[in-house]
Amino acid sequence: MATKLPLQNSNAANVAKAPAKSRAAAGGKTIEEMYQKKSQLEHILLRPDTYIGSIEKHTQTLWVYEKDEMVQRPVTYVPGLYKIFDEILVNAADNKQRDAKMDSVQVVIDVEQNLISVCNSGAGVPVEIHQEEGIYVPEMIFGHLLTSSNYDDNVKKTTGGRNGYGAKLTNIFSTEFIIETADGKRLKKYKQVFENNMGKKSEPVITKCNKSENWTKVTFKPDLKKFNMTELEDDVVALMSKRVFDIAGCLGKSVKVELNGKQIPVKSFTDYVDLYLSAANKSRTEDPLPRLTEKVNDRWEVCVSLSEGQFQQVSFVNSIATIKGGTHVDYVTSQITNHIVAAVNKKNKNANVKAHNVKNHLWVFVNALIDNPAFDSQTKETLTLRQSSFGSKCELSEDFLKKVGKSGVVENLLSWADFKQNKDLKKSDGAKTGRVLVEKLDDAAEAGGKNSRLCTLILTEGDSAKSLALAGRSVLGNNYCGVFPLRGKLLNVREASTTQITNNKEIENLKKILGLKQNMKYENVNSLRYGQMMIMTDQDHDGSHIKGLLINFIHSFWPSLLQVPSFLVEFITPIVKATRKGTKKVLSFYSMPEYEEWKESLKGNATGWDIKYYKGLGTSTAEEGKEYFSNLGLHKKDFVWEDEQDGEAIELAFSKKKIEARKNWLSSYVPGNHLDQRQPKVTYSDFVNKELILFSMADLQRSIPSMVDGLKPGQRKILFVAFKKIARKEMKVAQLVGYVSLLSAYHHGEQSLASAIIGMAQDYVGSNNINLLLPNGQFGTRTSGGKDSASARYIFTKLSPVTRILFPKDDDLLLDYLNEDGQRIEPTWYMPIIPTVLVNGAEGIGTGWSTFIPNYNPREIVANVRRLLNGESMVPMDPWYRGFKGTIEKTASKEGGCTYTITGLYEEVDETTIRITELPIRRWNDDYKNFLQSLKTDNGAPFFQDVKAYNDEKSVDFDLILSEENMLAARQEGFLKKFKLTTTIATSNMHLFDKKGVIKKYVTPEQILEEFFDLRFEYYEKRKETVVKNMEIELLKLENKARFILAVLSGEIIVNKRKKADIVEDLRQKGFTPFPRKAESVEAAIAGAVDDDAAEEPEEILVDPESSSSYIPGSEYDYLLAMAIASLTIEKVEELLADRDKMIIAVADMKKTTPKSLWLSDLESLDKELEKLDLKDAQVQQAIEAAQKKIRAKSGAAVKVKRQAPKKPAPKKTTKKASESETTEASYSAMDTDNNVAEVVKPKARQGAKKKASESETTEASHSAMDTDNNVAEVVKPKGRQGAKKKAPAAAKEVEEDEMLDLAQRLAQYNFGSAPADSSKTAETSKAIAVDDDDDDVVVEVAPVKKGGRKPAATKAAKPPAAPRKRGKQTVASTEVLAIGVSPEKKVRKMRSSPFNKKSSSVMSRLADNKEEESSENVAGNSSSEKSGGDVSAISRPQRANRRKMTYVLSDSESESANDSEFDDIEDDEDDE
């Protein structure tokens, strides 16, 4: 191997002479002159900017050190000269990283001698000959290019050197360069001199030194000619001196730094930063700049202060001054800006601050040690190394970031944001000009002129109100009156962003019309185009909201205007007008309380008045508009500013910062508190607290349901109309929307109403546990979470059979019905037999509050109600969703509520296939499929090889095909987490309106149930009182009717050929009990009022007719005089007396009945309906599984499962004997937590009627199953009870659902010694003549029988009570439960001219007649019914499933609740109705 020759001297003698030059053919230059090759040394001298930067003078504003302080000023310097000095200085600092014992750096800058020296202690350069290069190491690294100790990138170094130039560049650009070093390890001292730009060198001088001597010193004289300089100028010296201070700041207190023999007074990086801040503070008049410091670790030290409008940074990487920053500065700054952005936007969401905005307000100092740093050039002004290669992390602490946030930067940014916003908003400023072009503005002629202060701008709610205002303006003229219609509600500018405000055309128009200038302080209106703004809106809640938004708009930008007298006024119109019949006397009422007060003063006698409601300005005619403007003093109310409380009230209503205060404001609302519209002035605080609060309460009520019935007002209106219109027959949803608007005074959008109806009928998994309406059509599925429902024009609905059991008709008379526009509408709340808010859950977001209540198992709710009735403690309930096959487990609990984890189901089919068979609640199939398809691997490839969906609208069935590698990755991460098969819900945000209408937070479902229980029990007591009262009235009627008939038959009372008044007087004299009908209330004469109950027969109540004026005179004996002529028979008397005897017994029995018994009876009825739902759900699930098997069989998909996901743990066994009530309750439930039911079997029937049931019972009985297990192998239909062997009657008489049940049916319900006649669905159903009380006054009655008809009632002998009939076996058929059809051949329609010409015989008498008719028509009726298909056979009572008895035990989560961990409250938001 050849020995490598030593390096040659880098002087001109070493350069070989070129051969003789050959001349080029043209151009006067030889080829050699045109194309040259330079040595590296020549290249550096020829192109120095590549290595040391420019050698020309530059002027730049920089920090320099002079006169013992830091100064920022323009500096003229040569960057190349500064760089060669910096290279030697950085080398000295680098030695600290090599030798921690280094303790001093001495710098001398001698201007006179043009000499600079840098000496540092610590390990010197090894004084030893390099074995490969054959020269001493000091000469090698200082005198030969591309030599360095930093070439090994496998070794992480935190020094400045990297490329092998460094000190050699200083040598090259110096006339003299001296290197001296002492190597104590080798006891040698080294000195060598280079001259002529490293072109000449002396031989090294080696001498001995002590072991303790370790240092290195570089002395050089810059070649000033190459920098176009003659001496070291002051600016250059000041810049070099500042660089020495840099080194002192970077090295810290362990190294003493001297400059020209004087120690630098900087012992830490913090001291160094203070030099800058002290200098900056001299020019500040406000508080000194803050200095926030954090030494993150040994490699990172950060200081932060404030800057004004421009980002500043002072940073170092391994002692190198990165004057242009770099990735290390970005790394630190991004953490600070992200924190500040969040803090600013939290304080003012409209600030719209971005990271670069924050950066412009920061001054950041960074001192970092970074492994093997990389820069943009040899000048090393910018670090370019990626953050991941830094070799260390700089994660600023939260405490430090908070301190930065409190340093004033947030306030600075908020001020800057305000300034920017104002600047943007000023672009839309108005001006006092004579003419503005704004669409739909009817400008006043004098607006913007010298009389502008006298002009009034009327702002109306929409175009229709504008028409009224223009009609009224014709009275005043258009010189001083302008009109502008608002398009709906104005933007809440207090919470809007600048972009929203500037893009809002309405606000821009108002500023132009009024001549408003942004944020100007107005002491008067002289500079405006209008001197007064008058708000003219509807007298409803939305109208109040519009007023409030306009007030908020002015207060946000021009609060002083609200203090200008009479600037802001409102124009009010009557809500109700009462006109005296026959005269022109008109009374106007401007508030409902005022009207109610007048109505009460009439004492019910308002028949002489016509009442008209004015809900909107559009109701008033043009003539009325002129009338209003003719008397402006009566209709115009001035808003008055009293004190700062007015401003606080406005902020309370509209500021997001006042959320908690707004909650308290709404909580303290007292119903009935309202503005007195008779006062001429209104303070802003009164407006907010007495009028605007009504809108907020209405908004809240539309969003948060009632604890009592679980309904929002819109849903309650739907149910109110459903009871009237769709109890028996289905109707299009679109039609029902119209009826709800008509009959319940619904004033909002039809689309939201249709959505609410659809929502009440939905029954897919995750929607309702019990849907109150039936979904006859496509009402949405779990495929898209209900969004796939059909248009309201195409789908039908009707009342679900279970709804009337949940909301018994007997309670309707006890409810507090509302009245709007003189129309009787829905009650304040309905009174279900269990808290339906727990059954179907609730969700919503309103003013100040939101709510989320999960669904719970109705079986568990019923069981807990029974426990409360028995004086036992409730069993805690967990959320439950009908049809959901996954698990719901309590994962955390604390005082504020519990958190539950909802988990879907998956199975491992084989090594590469996962089957998902259930998703968490409210995770829909389509969304989930999109999620699966979006999953990617780390390299961007699809995670699954294929996603196969076998699910339908009711089921979940996905097969995920993936590689073995991805299967392993998914298993390691966890299938539940990877495939998002879990979600959480919480009970920490359960807000509801209580029975008094006050918003209240509930912590547990048991708390809701307990509060409901007390109220519901109170209403059962009221129901009993009402039933007893009605029965006693019926008893008196029976006695009076029998006595009346006998008196007529005996001639004691003569009715023919006499005046009614005389007969009434006879009856009064003979002591017959009067039952007058209620007189029509004052609302009966209201224009346009529609009340579907108007056609109902007036209520008859036992009263003293002399003492009340609210009843119709002469009507007190109509119940006798309106009896049919056929009733005047001895048989009828006997029948009435028999009914009376029964009634006496019934009254006595009812008085003995307890409210508890009534409730238990209703719960028993509910249990039966739930069993029908169980059966249907089981059948549906069986059909789903069969269909899925067929789909898989056709597609060839795998059916066998390798491994199944863990099932829900089975309930723990207990040796404790269950209580009797618990055993009974467990036997009711078809909603067991056991998911492995092989067979659903109905129990054997009791003895009942051997009738064939109608076909629809199959449908109704199987309406819905509530088992958590849907894997049912077989469904066995129930057998009917044995009953009387009788045939179907000739014609079943239709009963309107919105009538009360017949008295006999109600009595049977309360007669607990025998089976109820209706609620238990016995074989025999009592029949009554059906009377349609709808508005068209049409009566449906049974026509006479064609053959085998019964004899006239007068010729019949009274029959004793019928003996119990034997009941035959029942089979499930398809007739609706409770439906009594009427044969088409037997129906006749008869128009009645008066609502009072009905038969007035008692309910009991009609019942008795009906039974006789049924008995006499057995044979003929049977054949007739078979032909017509319109008759319905008796329905036997469905029995509970013969399932094993269950006992209630605590689940794992309940028994271990003491160990539950704390969790954070989860607040959910939701939607309107």
UniProtKB/Swiss-Prot annotation:
Biological processes annotated in GO: DNA topological change
Segments forming domain Topo IIA-type catalytic: 704-1163
Biased composition (Low complexity): 9-20, 1351-1360
Residues annotated as binding Mg(2+) 2: D538, D540
Superkingdom of this protein's organism: Eukaryota
EC category: isomerase
Active-site residues per Swiss-Prot or TrEMBL entry: Y794 (o-(5'-phospho-dna)-tyrosine intermediate)
Biased composition (Acidic residues): 1453-1473
Binding annotation for ATP: 91, 120, 148-150, 161-168, 378-380
Domain Toprim: 455-569
DNA repair in keyword set: no
Keyword Isomerase: yes
Site (Interaction with DNA): K489, N492, R662, K663, K712, Y746, S752, W924
Cofactor: Mg(2+); Mn(2+); Ca(2+)
Polar residues bias spans: 1394-1404, 1417-1427
Ranges of compositional bias, category Basic residues: 1200-1216, 1278-1288
Chemical reaction(s) catalysed: ATP-dependent breakage, passage and rejoining of double-stranded DNA
Site for Important for DNA bending, residues: I845
Region listing for Interaction with DNA, in residue ranges: 345-347, 980-989
PROSITE patterns per record: TOPO_IIA (PS52040), TOPOISOMERASE_II (PS00177), TOPRIM (PS50880)
Keywords: ATP-binding, DNA-binding, Isomerase, Magnesium, Metal-binding, Nucleotide-binding, Topoisomerase
Stated family: Belongs to the type II topoisomerase family.
Record-given protein name: DNA topoisomerase 2
Source organism per UniProt: Arabidopsis thaliana
